[in-house]
Amino acid sequence: MMVVFFDSRTALFCHMVEIMLCAIIAPSPLEFIFLEFIAGLAAINSLKDLSRRSQLLRTAVLVFLTYSVGYFAIDILLTGSPDKLVPRMFGSFGINAVFVSFAYIMIFVVEKIFGFTSKVTLVELSDVNNPILRELSEQCPGTFQHSMQVSNLAAEAAHRIGANVQLVRAGALYHDIGKIENPAFFTENQHGVNPHLALSPEQSARVVIAHVPDGLKRAEKGKLPMVIKDFISQHHGKGKARYFYTSYCNTHPDEEVDPAPFTYPGPNPQTKETSILMMADAV
């Protein structure tokens, strides 16, 4: 479970602590530590990139084989003969493997109770048939294509620096969903008519900046996890709607301009992943 929500190193540390505590009451502590360590190592390695349910079945089989081979090897080393193998031990190994198969249910329960977001959920959110993404593609085709391109670019950058690739990919797909409210006010969705020509720079900035809070409202309605909402709120940080700010300054050269109406609410990116998105979005 730990490897699904955190990383392999954290999962291995927790597994080792658990083994040492349980070994205190184990009849054969050294054999117990060895078997549990290799089985846990196999499970962690198999589940570190969990993205499909079928991986749980593969992991269950791998855990059973690891237990069985380890037990057989220990028995041969200690007795020199397989005659003293205890058949019911293989039944215990099978039960442990079956418990691995139930991990998907536990992942769902833990996500709901503690608000964690697993890699499995991120993969599911990245499906372009998700209702929110489907609506984005229908209402804002230009924004949807932009989000796909930013997602690919950001995911590649995340891979290069060791950040959470799946989180960046999913976050990038949803970062501009607030544009669904006013698609024609964004250049990638315009087809010859620019509605900003009928607005003042302050009004235009207000409409453009609103796609951030609008996106958060839509994310809340769609029950998107907090880690995805962070990409929506932070992808512009506390930057300015630069074009409209500059336009206002040019038309009011003798006025001390208040930047607040042209400034995004933020906050600035708080993680590597949201920082990557901000840079990829600006390319």
What is each stretch, according to the model?
Residues 133-283:
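Divalent metal-dependent catalytic cores for phosphoryl transfer on phosphate-bearing substrates
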Residues 1-148:
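Generic detector of multi-pass transmembrane helix bundles and their immediately adjacent loops
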